[in-house]
């Protein structure tokens, strides 16, 4: 059950998409949605100013003041976005309701945005993040740090209408622990989907028989949970381009992709594998990830 959903807000327009997605996903589970804004603490702003000074003609003091003003503006915009969301969807359910449905609250704190978001995420069932806007607070490397550090599934929401998220779900399947854990974490969503499509992909020239059979086996296992499932084995190019898998998912009508997040080594876990890096960069579907 997805009872606790964390939505980190950045003060960019795509915050609204993240909140809408959390509402769509959380409403059937009567979820509590926490909108979290981590306002950068003074030392974070000073450090950011020091980094930017190398490429700026402004003095360090001017940069600090500019970054402080921007952070304050982003915090105000994040709160406005949450207030609009709450008024639109949840005002009647602010303290729960006999008819069920989601509830939500705003929380603001001062600190390190990535570290404190990661810490807060450990107390949630799902983290919903908007894909980074240009200059946004959670670019790909920050998403990776949150994903690896929190131990919870992360739903990355692109700039699309989130209204139908999860009605048709595609699974990027590989017979690895990461993919198996992602499927398990996504079971509450999979159980509500109209259709679940299991997709597996091989490098160019590789025999697809074994991987296709693995996908079919997963589809059969999910079908025993009452899900309508199908499986497809895809032949890819030399680099196993995720665009092939994404294209097939969209062709089949998927509006959510479930995938495991793979890293190259346990010693250096912040180095994601090529497929994970590519799918983080290229996926224009809502993306449910677990490391």
Regions found by a protein language model. Give the residues of each.
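Short secondary-structure boundary segments
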Residues: 37, 131, 260-262, 291
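Small/aliphatic-rich secondary-structure junction motif
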Residues: 1-64, 165-234
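Intrinsically disordered or low-complexity boundary/linker segments at protein termini
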Residues: 1-20, 24, 93-101, 105, ...
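Charged helix-capping and loop-helix junction motifs
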Residues: 142, 212-216, 245-248, 271-276
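Structural beta-alpha unit
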Residues: 40-43, 50-53, 69-127, 224-257, ...
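Short, small-residue-enriched loops and turns at beta-alpha junctions
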Residues: 135, 204-209, 236-239, 265
């Amino acid at each position: 059950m997805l009872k606790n959903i964390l939505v980190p807000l950045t003060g960019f327009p795509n915050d609204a998409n993240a909140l809408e997605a959390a509402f769509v996903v959380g409403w059937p589970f009567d979820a509590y949605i926490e909108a979290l804004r981590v306002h950068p603490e003074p030392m974070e702003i000073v450090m950011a100013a020091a980094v930017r000074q190398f490429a700026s003609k402004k003095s360090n003091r001017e940069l600090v003041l500019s970054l402080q003003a921007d952070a304050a503006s982003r915090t105000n915009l994040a709160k406005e976005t949450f207030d609009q969301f709450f008024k639109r969807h949840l005002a009647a359910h602010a303290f729960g309701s006999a008819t069920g449905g989601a509830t939500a609250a705003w929380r603001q704190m001062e600190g390190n945005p990535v570290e404190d978001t990661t810490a807060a995420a450990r107390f949630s069932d799902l983290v919903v993040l908007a894909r980074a806007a240009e200059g946004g607070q959670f670019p790909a490397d920050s998403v990776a740090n949150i994903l690896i550090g929190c131990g919870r599934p992360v739903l990355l929401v692109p700039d699309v209408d989130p209204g139908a998220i999860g009605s048709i779900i595609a699974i990027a399947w590989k017979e690895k622990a990461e993919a198996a854990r992602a499927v398990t974490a996504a079971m509450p969503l999979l159980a509500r989907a109209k259709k679940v499509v299991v997709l597996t992909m091989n490098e160019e020239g590789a025999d697809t028989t074994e991987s296709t059979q693995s996908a079919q086996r997963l589809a059969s296992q999910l079908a025993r949970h009452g899900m309508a499932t199908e499986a497809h084995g895809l032949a890819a190019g030399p680099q196993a381009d995720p665009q092939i898998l994404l294209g097939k998912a969209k062709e089949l009508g998927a509006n959510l992709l479930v995938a495991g997040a793979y890293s190259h080594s346990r010693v250096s876990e912040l180095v994601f594998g090529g497929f994970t890096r590519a799918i983080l960069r290229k996926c224009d579907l809502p993306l449910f990830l677990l490391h």
